[in-house]
């Protein structure tokens, strides 16, 4: 009871998952992440907001974010391929001006990777396979400057849906509107719209700006471009 199972019928030629638009994938992932009590990686979430005292992985509502124990399908990115794909994504984000050139490549040996499924519980065929890459605990006391700290990566095509990166840039060096626009183009989404009612207490930092990305079926997704000043960390996130 109270467990969610993901069946993959691709081996039988029927294709269990629906073909989802990018905006629907983004919406399902955001809702699933928001069903968690602590959507960020535990070692680094503490630096951002302090311990919550709650267990990671609890779910609520009609979406869930669970470990995908079956592993990637034949058409999904394998763990041994993941950080090559991640580094291609980082390079693209640099070319777009979202990240500075000083951000280092993600060395596979320095990161942990877990495959998850973001699921619409009421219609489980609507599910999104994502890798979560996080700088390893072993690296916690090492130099984290100019490094990718956390990311959620589409297991189908390697697009970075959410990421936290330590950078030499300050918030004053950044244009959140430009970052949001280029990130939406990178994902193939419609241009972001202003988020109405920005409240300075919505984040654990005063340096952020929120946007709404129109959906094609499921609904709109709110994304945040922000910056943690004390640890010099840029983030683009779709979770609360």
Predicted regions: what they are:
Residues 1-240:
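Long, terminal "pre-/pro-" and other extracytoplasmic accessory regions
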């Amino acid at each position: 009871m109270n467990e969610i199972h993901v069946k993959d019928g691709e081996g039988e030629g029927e294709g269990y998952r629906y073909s989802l638009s990018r905006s629907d994938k983004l919406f399902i992932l955001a809702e699933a992440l928001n069903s968690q009590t602590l959507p960020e990686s535990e070692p680094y979430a503490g630096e951002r907001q302090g311990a919550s005292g709650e267990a990671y992985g609890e779910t609520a509502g009609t979406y869930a974010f669970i470990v995908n124990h079956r592993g990637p399908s034949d058409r999904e990115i394998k763990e041994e391929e993941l950080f090559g794909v991640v580094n291609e994504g980082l390079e693209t984000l640099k070319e777009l001006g979202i990240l500075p050139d000083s951000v280092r490549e993600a060395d596979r040996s320095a990161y942990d990777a877990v495959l998850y499924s973001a699921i619409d519980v009421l219609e489980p065929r609507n599910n999104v396979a994502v890798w979560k890459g996080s700088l390893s605990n072993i690296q916690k006391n090492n130099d984290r400057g100019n490094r990718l700290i956390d990311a959620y990566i589409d297991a189908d095509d390697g697009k970075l849906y959410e990421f936290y990166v330590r950078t030499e840039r300050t918030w004053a060096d950044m244009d959140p509107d430009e970052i949001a626009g280029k990130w939406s183009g990178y994902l193939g989404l419609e241009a972001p719209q202003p988020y109405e009612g920005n409240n300075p207490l919505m984040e654990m930092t005063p340096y952020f700006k929120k946007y709404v990305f129109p959906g094609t079926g499921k609904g709109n997704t709110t994304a945040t471009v922000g910056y943690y000043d004390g640890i010099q960390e840029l983030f683009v996130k779709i979770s609360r």
